[in-house]
């Protein structure tokens, strides 16, 4: 496990509780020592006892030596700078798994794309994990699920097998684009939810933004080649609900501080860990413009961050149009002949997401256990 923040440590716990031999790499020696000897991470997971089998080190080579699977949980904007140091310790068949939910500034690349550029490994050796995964809840062993995605079904299954235990279940799919963009885009909607929460707006406003936000997410992801059903599952709607509704979400918290009147600079100073949504707004809008995708919610979040839109003015703009229009609850990709493709209803999204969480069955066609 490369990274010892809240999510990296929690996922290391998931893997260790599943019977795997796990070593965490922490940048700070004192944190590595606390995890290794005290089985605690008081900086990021206060009150959580870590598995006795879990080990930690501040030496990257020691952590990676002989590893069949390397999970990476670092701030998305620091990923590329850390990849070179990993190269000497990669085995010929090592699988690298991204736990990150962001896009790289400047390039707009997803984390799996950054890994593919920075490491000398085949695409079949790269996987991503996403879903409704608030770290502290999982560290407390509250049951949940996630999706493991890779272009190689065998790789996805191997990683999902490692990342399954009595309180955490992993499904699989091969839609890496949809799985990653679902995790990225829901962060932006969660910032919007936090803003209106900080302003003091109620549940009607938040429900409107979540519903319209899912349409924006699906439109964007489908424009870049995703299967719309992926956005209906755990990596899309499931993650969106969890992130928007929980005070444990860093993106929700960042938005709430903005809504309460704090500046973008002040919010960044107050956050003890990165809120990936803040860094992803600008590159996502650039990608949306490149494909002609309208994202009014994300655009207004950008305006709030820039200080050109007052937080109290965000909700009316998000939930109304200049003229009455039909409600579109389907993500659509328009082809050259004008026909809409890849449609998915909000009701269908809800049904598939809840089906996936039922023990032992009812998963969507795209996310298979």
UniProtKB/Swiss-Prot annotation:
Keyword tags: Cytoplasm, Lipid biosynthesis, Lipid metabolism, NAD, NADP, Nucleotide-binding, Oxidoreductase, Phospholipid biosynthesis, Phospholipid metabolism
Name of the protein in its database record: Glycerol-3-phosphate dehydrogenase [NAD(P)+]
Species the sequence originates in: Leifsonia xyli subsp. xyli (strain CTCB07)
Places the protein is found: Cytoplasm
HAMAP family given in the database record: NAD_Glyc3P_dehydrog (MF_00394)
GO molecular function: glycerol-3-phosphate dehydrogenase [NAD(P)+] activity; NAD binding
Enzymatic reactions: sn-glycerol 3-phosphate + NAD(+) = dihydroxyacetone phosphate + NADH + H(+); sn-glycerol 3-phosphate + NADP(+) = dihydroxyacetone phosphate + NADPH + H(+)
EC number: 1.1.1.94
